[in-house]
Amino acid sequence: MPPEQGPVVLGIETSCDETGVGLVRNGTLLGEALSTSMDQHARYGGVVPEIAARAHVQALVPCVRAALSSAGLFVADIGAVAVTAGPGLATALHVGVAAAKAYATALDVPLYGVHHLAGHLAADLVDGEPLPDPLIALIVSGGHTSLLRVGDLARDPITHLGDTLDDAAGECFDKVARVLGLPYPGGPAVDRAAVGHDATALAFPRPLTGRADAPYTFSFSGLKTAVARWVESHPDSPVPAGDVIASFQEAVVDVLTAKAVRACLDHGIGDLLIVGGVAANSRLRALAASRCEQTGIRLRIPARRRCTDNGVMIAALGDLLVRAGAEPSPAELTAMPGAFLERAQLGTALPALHAA
């Protein structure tokens, strides 16, 4: 392989219930594989960490082999390893980090521990153009809801404009779906059940959207409670269940898109990136597209298959770090279940250019 092509980066994702593997070189996707233990968690109504960890142990090596096979490569062709070091379920993260360290050590190649949410920001780099610098990013998933200002993803610190005070948007979807008797996972179930129904049937609250509220901060626990109370107090309501679901969904995506667009306008930034599992929601995608078109903002959302957790996004981020000349993570890299998003890479000191 000519050196100018760069190394093949193996990406490993095991932060929750998906075992994801990707192979990327110089921005090009070479191979991928994905395994999920979602069905094993459905009976419990949520992810069970021990079950997820066991599933990762069983699926990780077969996924690496499948990705290599699809790329026509051998394990010896791997030139660097990137792995989600956090945040996520501790037991699940440990499986991925241990495997990544083993591959890096056995192959004598550099190891890059990366932040799971930064991986989402890099999710469609293999499908599209490089990310604009700067941009406003809205991360919406089961565990996180944040508005960010992002510069050079591989080099610059990430600025939080606002985060959720309580439930993340995806968590709210799951909890309300349970109240409404929808199957797990709740996000896709709500999306499907709302199709063709009246999203204006019920006026559920839009939390933290008043003039005196923090403009980029989110809160969804009150909305969740409002839906639950409405359902409890209207057992014989003539309002179709689909209208209730659509009205709830509209409240969530209205808040998300309004705050994201406002952040772009307030900061004079013309590019909005929406990522995370909830970014697969059809109504969120449609409303974001409409509002961005009205305000002249360029919208970027990954393909639905790239919104949920996967190894390609981790490989793409690792590849970006390699090409930016980032220092590898130390051999002592460990899982960081509660890692806060400040930079794309975890487990390293700040670069010299940011030193005092």
From Swiss-Prot:
It is found in: Cytoplasm. It holds the Pfam family TsaD. GO terms for cellular component: cytoplasm. InterPro entries: ATPase_NBD, Gcp-like_dom, KAE1/TsaD, Peptidase_M22_CS, TsaD. One of its GO terms (molecular function) is iron ion binding. Fe cation binds at residues 116, 120, 309. It catalyses: L-threonylcarbamoyladenylate + adenosine(37) in tRNA = N(6)-L-threonylcarbamoyladenosine(37) in tRNA + AMP + H(+). The keyword Nucleus does not apply. GO terms for biological process: tRNA threonylcarbamoyladenosine modification. Its cofactor is Fe(2+). Keywords: Acyltransferase, Cytoplasm, Iron, Metal-binding, Transferase, tRNA processing. It comes from the Bacteria. Substrate binds at residues 139-143, 174, 187, 191, 281. Binds 1 Fe(2+) ion per subunit. Coiled coil: none annotated. HAMAP family: TsaD. Required for the formation of a threonylcarbamoyl group on adenosine at position 37 (t(6)A37) in tRNAs that read codons beginning with adenine. Is involved in the transfer of the threonylcarbamoyl moiety of threonylcarbamoyl-AMP (TC-AMP) to the N6 group of A37, together with TsaE and TsaB. TsaD likely plays a direct catalytic role in this reaction. This is tRNA N6-adenosine threonylcarbamoyltransferase. The lineage of its organism: Bacteria, Bacillati, Actinomycetota, Actinomycetes, Frankiales.
